[in-house]
Design a protein with these regions (language model features):
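Conserved short alpha-helical segments that host acidic/polar catalytic motifs at enzyme active sites
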Residues: 1-129, 135-178
Length: 178
């Protein structure tokens, strides 16, 4: 994760996905002088920092996330931890990668894999739809932006790289494989 301080406040951000048009977005960002990127990976701008830069172009986190997801050709799923302890979870606009919310005795959690919180005694509470944005607190969660209608989940979750004890869209990976 990266720690970001901007006009939107202090927040930590982590992302998963692929930004196919990263160079184009970087060039657009540089067209307004005074910007730079600090996190580089293999000579390229770090995709998480690029996502944060896109988010910071708007007046609030929700509008910023929607802007970033619309600008990205590819997939952008993210989690943001705000300074007041809330988690903002956003699934990519096509729903390629999962985002799941767990519920347990100690509160709520969020993960890209259901087995991660099952091992801690949490149960499934919600799976975000494509483009959906949710705010998660210890005592519950609420939808900040409703899900879109088009779903293009990655089929390789069940056949190749999903953990056998994970569930995606209500279907267990191990059951789907055998």
């Amino acid at each position: 994760p990266l720690l970001v301080r901007s006009h939107l406040g202090l927040y930590a951000i982590t992302t998963v996905g692929i930004i196919n048009n990263a160079e184009e977005l970087v060039d657009q960002y540089f067209s307004d002088h005074g910007h730079q990127f600090m996190a580089m990976s293999s000579g390229k701008v770090n995709s998480t920092e690029l996502a944060a830069a896109l988010i910071n172009q708007k007046d609030n986190l929700v509008d910023g996330i929607l802007h970033a997801q619309q600008a990205v050709a590819g997939s952008l799923t993210l989690l943001i931890l705000t300074a007041d302890g809330e988690i903002i979870a956003a699934r990519d606009r096509m729903g390629r990668l999962p985002v799941l919310i767990g519920r347990g005795e100690r509160g709520y959690c969020v993960s890209f894999e259901s087995f991660a919180y099952h091992k801690l005694g949490y149960e499934d509470a919600c799976e975000l739809g494509p483009r959906e944005i949710v705010r998660i607190r210890a005592d519950g969660f609420d939808v900040l932006s409703p899900p879109g209608e088009e779903m293009k989940i990655c089929a390789f979750l069940w056949s190749y790289y999903g953990y056998p004890n994970s569930n995606y869209e209500g279907k267990n990976v191990e059951v789907m494989r055998y």
